């Protein structure tokens, strides 16, 4: 596992965006051989999306031959609802880059048969071989996507019941009213994430410190879903200073020395 200990959330976004752009450009994608990118929503990736849009506008990257798969979507929210992840992705990213609409893949939280929708999504991912890079965030309780504590580490895309803690955390997007936050979501599974060639998780804020500690210094444990990344051959945790508060000083020092070159020129 790589740990990239940066100073601010803005630094995290810039580093993540630069890494994605480097990966896409090195891959040299084409219509016949697209780059497959997994994407999250929420507050964690906002700075990364801003940086990606800026790099695209500067002519440093094209998304014309990039295919995206989003991590999750609420069940029951209309696609055009201001808090649907369809709306979030288009407002914060897709509307500002040159990605073809047909290359965008989002789960349908209003599907009549959610089991069939989840199966379709898994099959669509497999039709491309694999996701080359999956970017994600992490919840206060260590969940990735909507794989809440005690999720199977072999799980695939499915419907999940959201914990009260997650709904309370997400209520900030619904005017602080927990009753407006959906109780269910469709989400890629832990196994789906682990199938990706590379997984990059963005961790920002003091409230994520225990989750980061569990991911880096703890044991693999389904109660801390994020710890599954210890099993991945190419996992990267990109974090700001407040999120490292629960890590040992020597852990942060070790990774800072290892990643000196990669953290330059942000």
From Swiss-Prot:
Organism: Pectobacterium carotovorum subsp. carotovorum (strain PC1)
Site (Part of the allosteric site): 151, 158, 160-161, 254
Molecular function terms, GO-annotated: glucosamine-6-phosphate deaminase activity; identical protein binding
Record keywords: Allosteric enzyme, Carbohydrate metabolism, Hydrolase
Catalytic residues (positions): 72 (proton acceptor), 141 (for ring-opening step), 143 (proton acceptor), 148 (for ring-opening step)
PANTHER family: GLUCOSAMINE-6-PHOSPHATE ISOMERASE
PROSITE patterns in UniProt: GLC_GALNAC_ISOMERASE
Record-linked InterPro entries: Glc/Gal-6P_isomerase, Glucosamine6P_isomerase, Glucosamine6P_isomerase_CS, NagB/RpiA_transferase-like
Family annotation (CDD domains): GlcN6P_deaminase
Entry protein name: Glucosamine-6-phosphate deaminase
Function comment: Catalyzes the reversible isomerization-deamination of glucosamine 6-phosphate (GlcN6P) to form fructose 6-phosphate (Fru6P) and ammonium ion.
One GO CC term, this protein: cytoplasm
Pathway participation: Amino-sugar metabolism; N-acetylneuraminate degradation; D-fructose 6-phosphate from N-acetylneuraminate: step 5/5
Reactions catalysed: alpha-D-glucosamine 6-phosphate + H2O = beta-D-fructose 6-phosphate + NH4(+)
Keyword Hydrolase annotated: yes
Record-listed E.C. numbers: 3.5.99.6
Enzyme kind, highest EC tier: hydrolase
Hydrolase listed as a keyword: yes
Regulation of its function: Allosterically activated by N-acetylglucosamine 6-phosphate (GlcNAc6P).
GO biological process: carbohydrate metabolic process; glucosamine catabolic process; N-acetylglucosamine catabolic process; N-acetylneuraminate catabolic process
Quaternary state and interactors: Homohexamer.
């Amino acid at each position: 596992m790589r740990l990239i200990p940066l100073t601010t959330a803005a630094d995290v976004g810039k580093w993540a965006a630069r890494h994605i752009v480097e990966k896409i450009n090195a891959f040299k994608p084409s219509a016949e051989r697209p780059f497959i990118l997994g994407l999250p929503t929420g507050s964690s990736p906002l700075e990364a999306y801003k940086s990606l849009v800026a790099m695209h506008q500067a002519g440093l990257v094209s998304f014309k031959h990039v295919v995206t798969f989003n991590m999750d979507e609420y069940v029951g929210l209309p696609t055009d609802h201001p808090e649907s992840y369809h709306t979030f992705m288009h407002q914060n990213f897709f509307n500002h880059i040159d990605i073809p609409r047909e290359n965008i893949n989002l789960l349908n939280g209003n599907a009549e048969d959610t089991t069939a929708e989840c199966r379709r999504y898994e099959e669509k991912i497999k039709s491309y071989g694999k996701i080359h890079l999956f970017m994600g965030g992490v919840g206060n309780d260590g969940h990735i996507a909507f794989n809440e504590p005690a999720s199977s580490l072999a799980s695939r895309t499915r419907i999940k019941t959201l914990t009260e803690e997650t709904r309370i955390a997400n209520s900030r997007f619904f005017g602080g009213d927990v009753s407006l936050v959906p109780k269910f979501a469709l989400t890629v599974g832990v196994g789906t994430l682990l199938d990706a060639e590379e997984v990059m998780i963005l961790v920002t804020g003091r409230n994520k410190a225990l989750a980061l500690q569990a991911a880096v210094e703890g044991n693999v444990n389904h109660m801390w879903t994020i710890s599954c990344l210890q099993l991945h051959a190419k996992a990267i945790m990109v974090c700001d200073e407040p999120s490292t508060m629960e890590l040992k000083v020597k852990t942060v020092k070790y990774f800072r020395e290892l990643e000196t070159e990669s953290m330059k020129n942000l």
